[in-house]
A protein has these predicted regions:
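Conserved active-site regions of diverse hydrolases
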Residues: 19-320, 325
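Gram-negative bacterial Sec-dependent N-terminal signal peptides
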Residues: 2-20
Length: 325
């Protein structure tokens, strides 16, 4: 039986802090890595990264999940990099916490959030702001690189990253933040870049992903007990597990190989789950956007500031999610 992704997916991680009355979402602020970067690294590198055939400063072949979410909320500033005056602070390559010498010279998620917090120092964070936080994949991949030689240090690095997300949210709550969209990690072992390292690497990466997600869930549970903030969650691990299942609608013919490999590009990116060795295609991102919008609607069944009529998913998202002809 073919299964269709639905809003039920978002309850795979418990929905937290949703008892309060619904309020309008008037702005969207984003912290993250290449899965959410809409052009900050492109600006930082004077247009050198990402190279062609990547789309408009994004590490994919088209709009990212955050583009679809921002469109659905009618909040265009989240589709503009902070380096160009927008509210998207995500940088490709970013880790949650500072790493070793292999860490790219871009702001960590902690630094991104601190920059935003300082910018709101005198005014506070408007309670109608939705803050999206998705990071940790690069911390897990960095830990994987040292796991065989020093597993204890690698696991400590992963826990520190998950704890770092919790610290970011707590600091932003203290600054006035009241509504958050928080995303865990998909199976890092499923990335083509990790598959290429062999089965042991795949198993280690999956284990480290599980460690991160467990610590991440513990952080959210503590925040839910200690604060009154609305913590809306999206289970990226379960989402990618379902997208990798050929019985799921929408389906992808190829869920293991990248569309782009060196100078070679596949004939139809929409049939691939992965655009390159580490990033999803635009079609996969569109599914994520739809699920994020459904998560917001599930948390707030009363009207929130959705741009689309009757809470419909934007056409740009639905067209990408639809089964290819």
């Amino acid at each position: 039986m073919r299964r269709t992704l639905s809003a039920a997916l978002v309850v795979a991680i418990p929905m937290l802090g949703t008892a309060g009355a619904a309020t309008l979402i008037e702005r969207l602020v984003v912290f993250g890595d290449s899965l959410s970067d809409v052009g900050n690294v492109e600006v930082l590198s004077a247009g050198l990264l990402p190279p062609d055939p990547y789309f408009d400063g994004r590490y994919s072949n088209g709009p990212l999940w955050i583009d679809g979410l921002a469109e659905g909320l009618g909040l265009a500033s989240a589709r503009v990099p902070v380096l160009e005056g927008g509210t998207n602070f995500a940088f490709a390559g970013a880790t949650v916490v500072p790493g070793g010498a292999d860490t790219p010279p871009v702001p960590t998620l902690q630094a991104q959030a601190e920059a935003y917090r300082l910018s709101r120092l005198f005014t506070g964070i408007d309670p109608n702001t939705l803050i999206a936080v998705w990071g940790g994949a690069n911390d897990v991949r960095s830990a994987l690189a040292t796991h065989r030689t020093d597993p204890a240090a690698a696991e400590a690095r992963v826990r520190a990253a998950a704890d770092g997300v919790g610290g970011i949210v707590r600091d932003l709550i203290d600054a006035g933040g009241d509504r958050f969209l928080l995303v865990n990690q998909p199976d890092i072992g499923a990335l083509p870049a990790v598959r290429a390292q062999g089965e042991q690497a795949v198993e280690e990466a999956r284990s480290l992903t599980g460690l991160f997600n467990e610590a991440f869930a513990q952080q959210l549970a503590t925040l839910d007990e200690d604060t009154a903030a609305e913590l809306i969650t999206l289970d990226a691990f379960e989402l990618f597990e379902q997208l990798s299942d050929p019985g799921t609608v929408p389906s992808f013919d190829n869920t293991t190989d990248p569309c782009v490999a060196g100078s070679t590009m596949c004939a139809d990116p929409d049939e691939h789950l992965f655009w390159d060795e580490a990033h999803p295609t635009a079609r996969a991102h569109a599914v994520g956007a739809e699920e994020a919008l459904d998560a917001l609607r599930s948390a707030n069944p009363h009207p929130v500031a959705l741009a689309s009529p009757a809470g419909a998913v934007p056409s740009a998202v639905t067209s990408a999610v639809a089964e290819p002809a």
